[in-house]
UniProtKB/Swiss-Prot annotation:
This is Pyrokinin-5. The modification Leucine amide is found at L17. Transmembrane segments: none annotated. GO terms for cellular component: extracellular region. Signal peptide: none annotated. PROSITE patterns: PYROKININ (PS00539). Its main location: secreted. The lineage of its organism: Eukaryota, Metazoa, Ecdysozoa, Arthropoda, Hexapoda. It is found in: Secreted. It comes from Therea petiveriana (Domino cockroach). It comes from the Eukaryota. GO terms for molecular function: neuropeptide hormone activity.
Length: 17
């Protein structure tokens, strides 16, 4: 649940690059 979209198994990913 951070900037951008692409969360997975707790780990978060910034803006969808």
């Amino acid at each position: 649940s951070a900037s951008g979209s692409g969360e997975s198994s707790g780990m978060w990913f910034g803006p969808r690059l």
